[in-house]
């Protein structure tokens, strides 16, 4: 209900829009309303009433466009389905008496009358009365047309009521009253309006005429008037546009006349028939199709009403020679018969007579229409036995006539005439095709006269359907015989018809039967007739054919019957039939009838060729030798009787020789002796009659040999056959008695064919003892013929025929040697495969026929070559010989010329067919490698042939398990999509490679590698795929062949590198081998000289990148490296392994699990190779082009090892196992230098990712052995590494570093300074990693470290000791170091002036730490040491190294309290400022404070300053002079007097010459200060 409400809510909105003035929107609204009203079953009354109001209003509104008013009227009429009375009331209210209504009101009434007949009839009287009052008021043309439309609809409605009133739901009304009003309206219109009506008005009257007259005919009182109006209607046939409506009205009237059984007056009927026939047979302007159909319907109505009158009319009209009239009448007769009007069947004879009147008409249209009418008559049974035969004969005669006219056209014939004749011919065949011979009366008409059309040549084209008709008739008769057990012979009087003889029928049917092998219908029909009519041919044949025919028909059951097999079986049937008949006269007559039918077939037709063979077979079966001899002689003397004299005589004599060899040879010899060939040839030229030549006789002898009984043949072969052939050929090759090479193509072909047939005959004789003495000579002759053939054209079939001849000759004894086989095959291959491409060969032809012939010769020649190779290869039982012969094709299979390659593969595929069997030891590996990759060649023919050959190779070895699957895949290789080709080839490879013998894999790989070098890109890819597939399948079994395979692959590398894709496949092959034999491959690659060349590096990379081998590869290399470093000695092999590892890691191989072991091994290798040189024997011997001035660099083992370790660390960083070194890339330089190796190791150790403590612990475990290694370098490496690890707390926590600590204690005493240094560093770093261990082992550690302070020869050891002490002292108390304090302080002071910044800095910093650890016991001692050290701290405030300056400031701050000089703190704070104070100012302020506090310290500073005047650092010299200046300035008089002024002056004078200007100035200033002070206190200088 909700949907209902929504729907009507939308309608209300729509209706509301109708009140607007927008006409455009109204048009859309009315279209919508029409659809809505028609699709709605229930509508609200209020909505209906509103719609009636608006639609009626718009329909009558003159201001609205006509189209819109029409739409409104349609909506109004459609509303009647919901409320008819309201709609009718609305319309009637606007249809008032004596008041001219709106046009659309009238139209609405008319539409209501036809759409709602039942509801409209009760209102009809009122409507008609009102309309009657309006007619006189109508003046407008459009309004008159509207009233005519209304009259038409009202008449249709009343007519329906009159004839079907019982179906209406209310009591019967008085229809006469309604028809009275219609009569008055119609009469007024016809009298007043019709005479002056315009064309449009007239059309409206015509449309109303039929319904109105049809209605009036039911009233007897109106009948005469109504019929009188028909004449007016016929007179309107003037305008082509109106013809259809006139005929339509006429059809309505005729229908009503038949309904009310009203006979038309004769004259009127005649007029109607003439008018209607004119509508059908209009010539100038073809009738409109609809009008013609309506007129034909009118004729059907008239045929039903009075068939006699209609046929009389047709008989009268058809006698005219008018083509259109005759064609029209024949068409009308056909349609009338098709309508199966019962009354018409009684007039069959009249129809037949009418048809016979036009049988002589030569018009194509009339002939075709006649044939179609006869077809319909036959189908509907309108054929009578007495009169029917001429009609059947007409069908065949028309076919023959059209055939003659097409074969021998008149010159003036146009294309239209030719098309017409073809149309008649096709119609004749179509009539025969549809002819049902069992229709009532037809058997009597047809049998046996239908047989007369079997033999004549002109009816050959009808045999398809003729045989079927005869078969149906005979089978129907046979059925009758079985049903009633008595004969009801079909034979009736044949009249003047002459039936064919049994021999004629047999000859004709047997020859036509040969076409059954081609699937032709007439051939199947002929053999079918022979099967069912043996008694008609000869009574003796019934039983034999009954048993033989089923077997004979078996070959025809398949889709492709073999022509040769079918021909053989037919000839065998003929032989057996003639033997069964055993009647010499009957057989002789049959041979004559065969001869007489020679003209029925063309010379090139299959029927003619079979006829010759059948004739020869008949003569062979004839026992009358004189007759046979005479017939043969006649054919030899007058061969033109046979059509093609050569083929005819050859076939006939050949087949005749099967039973009459002696007769044939004798007649031939007699003819040959008597004939003068040259004279006969001249006569033939002038007379036009051809006679046999020597060439013809050569062919005949070959045919005789082929068909002769084999045992008789061998006895007469040499002298009577071969002797004659060679004699005739020799005579043909002589000019004036001199032998020359005859270039006559016909002679060469005839000779070759004859030799071939002789070879076949001898082979078929199967006499193993027979030695064919002419074999070698004939093969030589054949080779001479093929050698003479040009290599740029293929115009002759010589190659093809010679190849066939050689194939058969080669099989005969005596056998040929291998060299003979190879020479024969090579010569034939060289004469075919290098020919130009087929398209180029074809372009040499001038016509399409020439080009087709060239293509035919090409295909046949290639086929013959393939068969020759197949025969000669597989007939040999020696596998090696077979392979030798196959090798002849090798160069052609990989030819760069696409067409040569295609031919080679086509030949190979013919050699390797599935049914061949190879010798036992025949090897397929090499051939598979050669052939299989071409499954992706450029041409689909090559791809198919290559795959067929591959499958054939497997079958030849007896491997047939996967053949069906392979053939299924092969079909897809026709695709042009390269990806599809590769995919299919890959699938085939996976199957085929399983069957390659393992011992042949090496040669298979050699072939594929060659293919990778030489073939096109797609075949190259296929080579790679096949190679990989083979290795995957057989890789595990290749251990014995591994070295040879690898050597082969390496050999191809330089060339393959130039082809990227090929190179990648080769690398994948190595990887595949390695996945099975990793150790062997690794050993092989490690033997390559160092440094590895590009190819070797690429191989390592390939192995690493292959997922199947990468894991095994790294483990194998690690294993090798472990073995090579077992004695802590780095040999060349170990370096090779490192280089290999470098290439592997460089590919990004994951090393997480192998990293600890690999890292320690490589670090060990670096350590053990320090300072080594590469032995010359291991260096690569390849020469490298060097730039001018460049020196040859030899590889450094340590550098190579370091590079690998560097690569490892880079990968470790990527995997989060290590971090960037603080030394950067300098790390590796340090590491590979023997002098800095330990520094590099320390930096490397610092780059370890301590968060990966598990990894580092594994490294420590592997590296622990280094601490006890016999190699000093390795011990240093281990000690350096561990020294850095000692500072990591997490490693102390999880690892066992206590043992390492012990080793460090021991090594701290070692004679090797670097080892001692690293041990001391490790002890010092222990303070960071394990403070508790320092406190626990403080004595041991302090003693070791302090001992390092005495190693003055190696500053680095001292520096390391100072640093270690500083770290350790930070963890100890003054009590812990009490025993060592003095010694440490004294040793530390000795390094304040060390030249190395690091030592000075560490010493100063350590002194600072010592100050904090000074106990009560050592306080005075330390204060004295501070006084002594004060000069160093003050001067080094301006040390070149800023860090040292800062350290001096810090130590001064700490040490001042020991001297009681706290006043200096403020001064020292100035040193913390951003801008340092000037040294002179600082020193003067310092000295000023000291002078006030402690003059002794100033004096101590002065006494220690002299040593700094000679310092190597300019800044220190300058500072010392400035300090001296400040001291002099602030010394008291007593201390100034104590100065050694002479020495001081001398030293200052020397410094005035110092290279440094600042020193010079300071010295000058100090001298001036000295002079001034001396003056001040009156002391002489």
Curated annotation (Swiss-Prot):
One Gene Ontology biological process: spermatogenesis
UniProt keyword Nucleus, yes or no: no
Free-text disruption phenotype from the record: Embryonically lethal before 10 dpc.
Keywords, ordered alphabetically: Cell projection, Cilium, Cytoplasm, Cytoplasmic vesicle, Differentiation, Flagellum, Repeat, Spermatogenesis
Post-translation changes: Constitutively phosphorylated on serine and threonine residues in acrosomal region of the sperm head, midpiece and flagellar regions of noncapacitated spermatozoa. Phosphorylation on tyrosine residues increases upon sperm capacitation within the acrosomal and tail regions in a protein kinase A (PKA)-dependent signaling pathway.
Tissue-by-tissue expression: Expressed strongly in round spermatids and fully mature spermatozoa. Expressed weakly in pachytene spermatocytes (at protein level). Isoform 2 is specifically expressed in the testis. Isoform 2 is expressed in pachytene spermatocytes and round spermatids. Isoform 3 is weakly expressed in testis.
Coiled-coil annotated spans: none
Principal location listed in the UniProt entry: cytoplasm
HEAT repeat start-end pairs: 123-160, 305-342, 401-441, 464-501, 526-543, 544-580, 658-695, 773-815, 960-997, 1017-1055, 1112-1150, 1153-1191, 1254-1291, 1295-1332, 1359-1379, 1380-1416
Any one Pfam family match given in the protein's UniProt record, by short name: HEAT_MROH2B_C
Keyword Cell membrane: no
Cited InterPro entries: ARM-like, ARM-type_fold, HEAT_Maestro, HEAT_MROH2B-like, Maestro-like_HEAT, Maestro_heat-like_prot, MROH2B-like_N_HEAT
Subcellular location: Cytoplasm; Cytoplasmic vesicle, Secretory vesicle, Acrosome; Cell projection, Cilium, Flagellum
GO CC, any one term: acrosomal vesicle
Physiological role: May play a role in the process of sperm capacitation.
Oligomer and partners: Found in a complex at least composed of MROH2B isoform 2, PRKACA isoform 2 and TCP11. Interacts with PRKACA isoform 2. Interacts with TCP11.
Entry protein name: Maestro heat-like repeat-containing protein family member 2B
The species this protein was found in: Mus musculus
């Amino acid at each position: 209900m909700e949907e209902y409400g929504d729907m009507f809510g939308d309608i209300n909105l729509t209706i509301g829009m109708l009140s607007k003035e927008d006409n455009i929107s109204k048009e859309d609204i009315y279209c919508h309303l029409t659809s809505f009203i028609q699709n709605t079953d229930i509508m609200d009354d209020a909505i209906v009433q509103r719609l009636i109001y608006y639609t009626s209003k718009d329909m009558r509104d003159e201001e609205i466009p006509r189209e819109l008013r029409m739409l409104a009227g349609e909506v109004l009429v459609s509303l009647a389905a919901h409320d008819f009375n309201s709609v009718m009331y609305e319309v009637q209210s606007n249809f008032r008496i004596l008041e001219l209504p709106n046009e659309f009101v009238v139209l609405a009434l008319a539409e209501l009358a036809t759409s709602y007949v039942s509801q409209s009839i009760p209102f009809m009287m009122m409507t008609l009365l009102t309309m009657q009052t309006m007619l006189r008021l109508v003046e407008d043309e459009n309004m008159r047309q509207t009233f005519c439309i209304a009259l038409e609809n009202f008449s249709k409605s009343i007519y329906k009521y009159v004839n079907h009133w019982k179906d209406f739901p209310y009591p019967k009304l008085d229809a006469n009253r309604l028809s009275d009003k219609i009569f008055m309206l119609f009469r007024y219109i016809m009298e007043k309006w019709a005479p002056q009506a315009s064309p449009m008005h007239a059309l409206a009257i015509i449309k109303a005429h039929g319904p109105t007259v049809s209605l009036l005919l039911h009233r007897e009182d109106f009948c005469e008037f109504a019929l009188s109006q028909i004449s007016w209607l016929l007179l309107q046939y003037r305008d082509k546009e109106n013809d259809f409506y006139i005929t339509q009205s006429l059809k309505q009237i005729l229908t009503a006349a038949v309904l009310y059984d009203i006979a038309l007056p004769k004259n009127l009927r005649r007029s109607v028939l003439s008018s209607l026939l004119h509508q059908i047979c209009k010539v100038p302007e073809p009738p409109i199709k609809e009008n013609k159909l309506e007129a034909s319907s009118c004729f059907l109505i008239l045929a039903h009403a009075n068939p006699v009158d209609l046929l009389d009319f047709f008989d009268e009209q058809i006698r005219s020679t008018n083509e259109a009239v005759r064609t029209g009448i024949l068409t009308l007769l056909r349609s009338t018969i098709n309508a199966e009007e019962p009354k018409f069947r009684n007039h069959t004879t009249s129809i037949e007579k009418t048809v016979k009147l036009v049988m002589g008409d030569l018009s194509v249209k009339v002939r075709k229409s006649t044939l179609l009418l006869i077809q319909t008559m036959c189908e509907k049974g309108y054929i009578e036995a007495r009169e029917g035969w001429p009609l059947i004969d007409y069908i065949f005669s028309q076919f023959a006539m059209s055939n003659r006219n097409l074969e021998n056209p008149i010159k003036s014939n146009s294309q239209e005439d030719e098309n017409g004749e073809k149309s008649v011919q096709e119609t004749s065949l179509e009539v025969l095709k549809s002819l049902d011979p069992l229709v009532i009366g037809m058997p009597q008409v047809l049998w046996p006269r239908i047989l007369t059309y079997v033999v004549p040549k002109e009816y050959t084209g009808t045999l398809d359907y003729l045989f079927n008709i005869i078969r149906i008739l005979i089978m129907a008769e046979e059925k009758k015989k079985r049903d009633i057990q008595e004969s009801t012979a079909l034979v009736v009087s044949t009249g003047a018809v002459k039936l064919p003889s049994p021999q004629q029928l047999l000859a004709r049917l047997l020859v036509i039967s040969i076409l059954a092998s081609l699937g032709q219908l007439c051939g199947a029909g002929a053999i079918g007739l022979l099967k069912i009519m043996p008694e008609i041919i000869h009574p003796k044949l019934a039983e034999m054919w009954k048993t033989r025919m089923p077997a004979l028909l078996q070959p025809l059951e398949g889709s492709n019957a073999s022509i040769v097999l079918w021909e053989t079986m037919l000839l065998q049937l003929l032989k057996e039939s003639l033997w069964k008949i055993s009647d010499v006269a009957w057989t002789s007559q049959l041979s004559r009838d065969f001869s007489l039918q020679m003209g029925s077939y063309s010379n090139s037709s299959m029927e003619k060729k079979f006829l010759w063979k059948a004739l020869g077979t008949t003569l062979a079966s004839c026992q009358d030798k004189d007759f046979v001899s005479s017939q043969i002689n006649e054919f030899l003397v007058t061969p033109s009787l046979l059509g093609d004299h050569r083929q005819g005589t050859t076939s006939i004599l050949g087949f005749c020789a099967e039973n009459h060899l002696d007769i044939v040879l004798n007649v031939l010899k007699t003819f040959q002796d008597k004939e003068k060939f040259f004279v006969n040839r001249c006569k033939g030229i002038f007379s036009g009659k051809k006679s046999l030549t020597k060439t013809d006789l050569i062919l005949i002898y070959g045919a005789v040999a082929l068909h002769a009984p084999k045992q008789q043949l061998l006895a007469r072969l040499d002298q009577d056959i071969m002797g004659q052939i060679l004699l005739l050929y020799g005579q043909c090759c002589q000019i004036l008695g001199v032998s020359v090479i005859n270039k006559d193509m016909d002679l060469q072909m005839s000779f070759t064919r004859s030799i071939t047939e002789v070879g076949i005959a001898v082979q078929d004789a199967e006499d193993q003892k027979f030695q064919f003495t002419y074999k070698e000579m004939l093969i030589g002759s054949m080779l001479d013929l093929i050698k003479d053939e040009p290599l740029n054209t293929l115009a002759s079939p010589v190659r093809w025929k010679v190849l066939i001849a050689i194939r058969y000759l080669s099989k005969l004894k005596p056998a040929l040697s291998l060299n003979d086989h190879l020479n024969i095959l090579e010569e034939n291959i060289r004469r075919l495969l290098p020919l130009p491409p087929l398209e180029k060969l074809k372009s040499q032809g001038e016509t399409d026929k020439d080009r087709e012939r060239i293509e035919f010769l090409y295909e046949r020649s290639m086929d013959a070559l393939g068969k020759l190779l197949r025969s000669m290869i597989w007939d040999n039982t020696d596998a090696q010989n077979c392979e030798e012969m196959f090798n002849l094709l090798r160069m052609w299979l990989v030819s760069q010329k696409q067409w040569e390659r295609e031919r080679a593969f086509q030949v190979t595929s013919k050699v390797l067919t599935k049914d061949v069997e190879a010798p036992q030891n025949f090897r397929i590996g090499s051939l598979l490698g050669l052939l299989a990759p071409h499954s992706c060649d450029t041409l689909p023919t090559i791809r198919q042939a290559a795959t067929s050959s591959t499958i054939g190779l497997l079958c030849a070895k007896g491997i047939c398990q996967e053949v069906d699957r392979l053939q299924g895949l092969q079909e897809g290789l026709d695709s042009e999509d390269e990806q599809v080709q590769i995919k299919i080839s890959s699938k085939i490879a996976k199957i085929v490679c399983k069957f390659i013998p393992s011992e042949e894999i090496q040669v298979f790989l050699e072939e594929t590698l060659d293919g990778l070098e030489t073939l096109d890109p797609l075949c190259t890819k296929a080579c790679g795929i096949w190679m990989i597939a083979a290795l995957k399948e057989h890789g595990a079994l290749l251990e014995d062949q591994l070295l040879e395979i690898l050597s082969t692959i390496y050999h191809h590398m330089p060339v393959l590198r130039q082809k990227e894709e090929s190179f990648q496949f080769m690398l994948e092959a190595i990887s595949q081998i390695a996945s099975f034999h990793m150790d062997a491959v690794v050993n092989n690659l490690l033997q390559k000289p160092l440094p590895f060349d590009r190819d070797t590096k690429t191989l390592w990379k390939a192995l690493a990148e292959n997922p199947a081998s990468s894991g095994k590869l790294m483990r194998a290399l690690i294993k090798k490296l472990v073995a090579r470093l077992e004695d802590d000695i780095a040999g060349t092999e170990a370096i090779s392994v490192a280089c290999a590892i470098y290439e592997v890691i460089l590919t990004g191989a994951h090393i997480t699990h192998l990293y600890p072991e690999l890292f320690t091994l490589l670090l060990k290798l670096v350590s053990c190779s320090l300072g080594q040189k590469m032995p010359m024997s291991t260096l690569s011997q390849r020469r490298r082009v060097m730039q001018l001035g460049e020196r040859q660099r030899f590889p450094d083992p340590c550098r190579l090892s370091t590079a690998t370790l560097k690569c490892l660390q880079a990968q470790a960083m990527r995997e989060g196992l290590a971090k960037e070194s603080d030394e950067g890339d300098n790390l590796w330089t340090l590491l590979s230098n023997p002098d800095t190796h330990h520094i590099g190791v320390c930096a490397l150790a610092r780059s370890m990712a301590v968060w990966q403590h598990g990894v580092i612990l594994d490294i420590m475990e592997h590296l622990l052995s280094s601490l006890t290694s016999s190699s000093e370098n390795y011990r240093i490496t281990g000690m350096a590494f561990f020294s850095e690890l000692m500072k990591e707390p997490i490693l102390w926590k999880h690892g066992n570093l206590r043992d390492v600590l012990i080793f460090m204690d021991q090594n701290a005493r070692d004679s090797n300074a670097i080892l001692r240094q690293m041990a001391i560093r490790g002890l010092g770093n222990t303070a960071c990693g394990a403070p508790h261990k320092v406190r626990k082992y403080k004595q041991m550690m302090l003693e070791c470290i302090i001992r390092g302070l005495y190693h003055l020869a190696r500053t680095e050891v001292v520096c390391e000791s100072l640093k270690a002490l500083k770290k350790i002292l930070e963890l100890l108390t003054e009590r812990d170091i009490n025993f060592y304090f003095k010694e440490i302080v004294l040793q530390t002071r000795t390094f304040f002036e060390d030249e190395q910044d690091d030592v000075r800095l560490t010493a100063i910093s350590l002194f600072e730490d010592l100050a904090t650890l000074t106990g009560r016991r050592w306080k005075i001692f330390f204060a004295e040491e501070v006084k002594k050290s004060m000069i160093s701290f003050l001067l080094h405030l301006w040390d070149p190294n800023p860090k040292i300056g800062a350290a001096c400031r810090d130590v001064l701050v700490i040490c001042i309290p020991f001297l009681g000089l706290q006043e200096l703190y403020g001064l020292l704070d100035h040193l913390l400022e951003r801008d340092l104070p000037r040294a002179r100012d600082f020193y003067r302020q310092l000295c000023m404070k000291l002078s006030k506090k402690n003059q002794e310290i100033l004096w101590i500073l002065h006494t220690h300053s002299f040593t700094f005047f000679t310092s190597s650092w300019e800044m220190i010299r300058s500072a010392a002079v400035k300090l001296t200046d400040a001291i002099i300035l602030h010394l008291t008089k007593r201390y100034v007097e104590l100065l050694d002024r002479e020495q001081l002056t001398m030293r200052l004078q020397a410094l005035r010459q110092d290279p440094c200007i600042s020193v010079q100035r300071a010295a000058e200033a100090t001298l001036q200060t000295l002079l001034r002070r001396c003056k001040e206190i009156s002391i002489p200088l």
